[in-house]
């Protein structure tokens, strides 16, 4: 881990099982274990889903904004709750109160902010927000569950 509470892509790849095209966290800008995490997703026109969402009016799919926030939640959980066993993962378990406030388009830099609320019996609850240029694009509460791989 970097000394200044950032995580580069190599460190993110060590924590998350996701790979292209579903790795949606490019870098962790700051975090404090058990408290919060701030990450970035650079939105490129080269993302494969922009071909169909929507032709002539590309918009980052809302469900993928939530997935990016969930991945940030997973990273925070990995860093906060302790080392997982080799056959364990954090699974996206629930989402509550999701709200979309503005579209995210190619060229945007999406800042993902997640705040740890609590952990009980292997289930972590976090509050998340995705922002572009300081404006909220999406907000939700998410849970991820620590489970053995199936």
Curated annotation (Swiss-Prot):
<dbReference type="GO" id="GO:0006633">
    <property type="term" value="P:fatty acid biosynthetic process"/>
</dbReference>
<comment type="similarity">
    <text>Belongs to the thioester dehydratase family. FabZ subfamily.</text>
</comment>
<protein>
    <recommendedName>
        <fullName>3-hydroxyacyl-[acyl-carrier-protein] dehydratase FabZ</fullName>
        <ecNumber>4.2.1.59</ecNumber>
    </recommendedName>
</protein>
<keyword id="KW-0444">Lipid biosynthesis</keyword>
<keyword id="KW-0441">Lipid A biosynthesis</keyword>
<keyword id="KW-0456">Lyase</keyword>
<keyword id="KW-0963">Cytoplasm</keyword>
<dbReference type="InterPro" id="IPR013114">
    <property type="entry name" value="FabA_FabZ"/>
</dbReference>
<dbReference type="InterPro" id="IPR029069">
    <property type="entry name" value="HotDog_dom_sf"/>
</dbReference>
<dbReference type="GO" id="GO:0005737">
    <property type="term" value="C:cytoplasm"/>
</dbReference>
<comment type="function">
    <text>Involved in unsaturated fatty acids biosynthesis. Catalyzes the dehydration of short chain beta-hydroxyacyl-ACPs and long chain saturated and unsaturated beta-hydroxyacyl-ACPs.</text>
</comment>
<dbReference type="GO" id="GO:0019171">
    <property type="term" value="F:(3R)-hydroxyacyl-[acyl-carrier-protein] dehydratase activity"/>
</dbReference>
<dbReference type="Pfam" id="PF07977">
    <property type="entry name" value="FabA"/>
</dbReference>
<feature type="active site">
    <location>
        <position position="53"/>
    </location>
</feature>
<keyword id="KW-0443">Lipid metabolism</keyword>
<dbReference type="GO" id="GO:0016020">
    <property type="term" value="C:membrane"/>
</dbReference>
<dbReference type="InterPro" id="IPR010084">
    <property type="entry name" value="FabZ"/>
</dbReference>
<dbReference type="GO" id="GO:0009245">
    <property type="term" value="P:lipid A biosynthetic process"/>
</dbReference>
């Amino acid at each position: 881990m970097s000394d200044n509470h950032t995580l580069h892509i190599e460190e993110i790849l060590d924590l998350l099982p996701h790979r292209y095209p579903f790795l949606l966290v490019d870098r962790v800008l700051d975090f404090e274990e058990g408290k919060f995490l701030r990450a970035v997703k650079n939105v490129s026109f080269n993302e494969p889903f922009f071909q169909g969402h929507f032709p002539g009016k590309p918009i980052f799919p809302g469900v993928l904004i939530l997935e990016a926030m969930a991945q940030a939640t997973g990273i925070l959980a990995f860093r906060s709750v302790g080392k997982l066993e080799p056959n364990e993962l954090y699974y996206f378990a629930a989402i509550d109160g999701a709200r979309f406030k503005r579209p995210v388009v190619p060229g945007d830099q999406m800042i993902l902010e997640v705040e740890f609320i609590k952990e009980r019996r292997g289930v972590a609850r976090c509050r998340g927000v995705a922002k572009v240029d300081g404006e909220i694009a999406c907000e939700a509460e998410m849970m991820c569950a620590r489970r053995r791989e199936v």
